[in-house]
């Protein structure tokens, strides 16, 4: 079973890693940690009871050096399938992979944006970010619209490879009075 561990850094040295207690559940896996842009929440993936099924994305409040208040993100993010690999853009957009939402096949990358109603709204960025294979582990280079992701696309053996991408800048020109 996977665990999330924490370690303190002093200059160039890391201290001893210790398991982060998210729950007293010792049978479930806890993996793929991502800290929210405001630093108040740790998002993670788990198969612990109370989810929608498979692997779900959960979050727990970070309070000093401890945690408290575990929450399942629920719908529309979690499904009876697997949701994995959460990561954030600085603007708060949550990127994750799922095989439970309609997509191009296998795990697809999705974007969850918080709308004016304070609820998540999902977007599927389509091809070429997603493919018929498993596409996951999307990460960005800081605030730039470029980054990396993993995929087993175009590999008859099913091996994962790392791909780079750059999202095109969308410019809209409005003319009128």
Regions found by a protein language model. Name each.
Residues 1-177:
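Short, conserved micro-motifs composed of acidic
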């Amino acid at each position: 079973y996977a665990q999330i561990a924490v370690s303190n850094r002093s200059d160039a040295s890391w201290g001893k890693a210790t398991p982060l207690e998210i729950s007293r559940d010792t049978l479930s896996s806890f993996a793929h940690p991502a800290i929210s842009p405001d630093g108040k929440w740790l998002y993670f993936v788990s198969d612990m009871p109370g989810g929608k099924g498979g692997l779900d994305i959960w979050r727990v409040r970070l309070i000093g050096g401890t945690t408290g208040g575990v929450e399942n993100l629920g719908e529309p993010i979690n499904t009876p399938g697997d949701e994995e690999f959460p990561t954030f853009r600085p603007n708060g957009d949550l990127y994750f992979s799922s095989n439970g939402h309609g997509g191009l096949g296998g795990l697809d990358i999705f974007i969850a944006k918080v709308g004016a109603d304070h609820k998540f709204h999902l977007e599927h960025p389509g091809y070429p970010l997603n493919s018929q294979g498993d596409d996951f582990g999307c990460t960005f280079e800081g605030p730039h619209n470029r980054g990396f992701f993993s995929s087993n696309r175009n590999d008859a053996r099913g091996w994962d490879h790392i791909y780079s991408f750059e999202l095109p800048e969308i410019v809209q020109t409005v003319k009128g009075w």
